[in-house]
């Protein structure tokens, strides 16, 4: 499905906006601080229940207001009816999800209905940040590929939290075994899903990287979070004293990673900023295209500050690849000259200024 209409109320510096959207490219043009990134943030929040810029709800609510409200209309594909989704959140962080006019929906339902890929200047953490960012990349794919993944992941987090708390109190492994008896099968199952997903998507990533960065030989390897030759049950028992001293579980799926190297060297040590951005875009595009091929559902792409770190030829390469996906794309830019050659009959340009958003006529 595509997002055909977006309503925003009291979000960041946007008091009210009602945006009719193109099914292709949607360009948001304005100066720094105008609110163009806030539109991307609103779309992301509608599909995730949280912002990509702040974990505190109060920071995204317009000053002097009690809550923000977001609403989207999803256009139908073949044999599908039009859908509506809504999200409101107050300063205490309490959320209300509405789907097709009915309250009581879940954030996970929004994520299923509005799958998206986000590319921002801060997104370099996917490549040079800690393992949690690359786990999130893998888990996005598992969430959309395996219906049982989300509940297993939630239970894993719960059990790890309980186990870590218990490590502060127990003196013998037998006292913590009840948690491990639940944790071990979940850990093995999640590890299997993650490993299979990385195996399945690696060729897509490799092919996209060859187009974007043909000068490098890149490798991608899944690290499961413990010695792959070790049985996880035996490892937990063997490392009990160490875990008890640390007061947390040192090994497991919560330590998994995706190792990305160029010519055998970590990419953050080999690639320039512009090359890292292209690699980040390649990963997001490959994941979105793999998702579409597997599910038959399109993925949205959100690109903040499109031109940053990229010269003209690289911008053109990225724009051409995005167009080839035939997906809905939202792009922010400071200068309209950076995106005018991307405008066509299936796109719209919005001028954003001080939280006010207007559709711009196309010549």
UniProtKB/Swiss-Prot annotation:
Any one GO biological process: double-strand break repair
Subcellular location(s) of the protein: Cytoplasm
InterPro entries, A to Z: DNA-binding_RecF, DNA-binding_RecF_CS, P-loop_NTPase, RecF/RecN/SMC_N, RecF_2
Annotated positions binding ATP: 30-37
Cellular component, GO annotation: cytoplasm
Keyword Nucleotide-binding: yes
Gene3D superfamilies (alphabetical): P-loop containing nucleotide triphosphate hydrolases, RecF/RecN/SMC, N-terminal domain
Keywords: ATP-binding, Cytoplasm, DNA damage, DNA repair, DNA replication, DNA-binding, Nucleotide-binding, SOS response
Molecular function (Gene Ontology), one example: ATP binding
Principal cellular location given in the protein's record: cytoplasm
Xref: Pfam families: SMC_N (PF02463)
PANTHER family assigned to the protein according to its UniProt record, in alphabetical order: DNA REPLICATION AND REPAIR PROTEIN RECF
Function (record text): The RecF protein is involved in DNA metabolism; it is required for DNA replication and normal SOS inducibility. RecF binds preferentially to single-stranded, linear DNA. It also seems to bind ATP.
UniProt similarity note: Belongs to the RecF family.
UniProt protein name: DNA replication and repair protein RecF
UniProt source species: Photorhabdus laumondii subsp. laumondii (strain DSM 15139 / CIP 105565 / TT01) (Photorhabdus luminescens subsp. laumondii)
Lineage, top ranks: Bacteria, Pseudomonadati, Pseudomonadota, Gammaproteobacteria, Enterobacterales
């Amino acid at each position: 499905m595509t997002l055909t209409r977006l309503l925003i109320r009291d979000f960041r510096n946007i008091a009210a906006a009602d945006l009719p959207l193109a099914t292709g490219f949607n360009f948001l043009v304005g100066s720094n601080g105008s609110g163009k990134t806030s539109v991307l943030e609103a779309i992301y929040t509608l599909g995730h229940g949280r912002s990509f810029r702040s974990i505190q709800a109060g920071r995204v609510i317009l000053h002097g207001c009690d809550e923000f409200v977001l609403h989207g209309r999803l256009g139908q594909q073949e044999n599908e009816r039009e859908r509506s989704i809504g999200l409101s959140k107050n300063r205490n962080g309490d959320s209300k999800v509405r789907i097709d006019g009915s309250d009581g929906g879940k954030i996970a339902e929004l994520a299923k209905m509005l799958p998206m890929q986000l590319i921002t200047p801060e997104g370099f953490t996917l490549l040079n940040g800690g393992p949690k960012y690359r786990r999130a990349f893998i888990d996005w794919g598992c969430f959309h590929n395996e219906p049982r993944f989300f509940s297993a992941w939630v239970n894993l987090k719960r059990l790890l939290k309980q186990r870590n708390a218990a490590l502060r109190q127990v003196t013998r492994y037998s006292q913590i075994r009840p948690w491990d008896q639940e944790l071990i099968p979940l850990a093995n199952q999640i590890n299997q899903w993650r490993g299979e997903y990385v195996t399945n998507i690696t060729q897509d990533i490799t092919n996209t990287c060859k187009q974007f960065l043909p000068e490098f030989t890149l490798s991608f390897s899944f690290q499961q979070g413990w010695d792959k030759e070790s049985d996880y049950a035996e490892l937990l028992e063997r490392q009990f004293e160490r875990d008890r001293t640390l007061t947390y579980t040192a090994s497991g799926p919560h330590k998994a990673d995706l190792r990305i190297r160029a010519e055998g060297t970590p990419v953050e040590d080999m690639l320039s900023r512009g090359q890292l951005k292209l690699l980040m875009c390649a990963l997001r595009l490959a994941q979105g295209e793999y998702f579409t091929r597997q599910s038959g559902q399109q993925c949205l792409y959100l690109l903040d500050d499109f031109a940053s770190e990229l010269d003209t030829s690289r911008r053109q390469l990225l724009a051409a690849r995005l167009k080839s996906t035939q997906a809905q794309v939202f792009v922010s830019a400071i200068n309209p000259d950076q995106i005018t050659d991307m405008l066509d009959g299936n796109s719209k340009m919005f001028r954003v200024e001080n939280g006010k958003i207007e559709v711009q006529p196309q010549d």
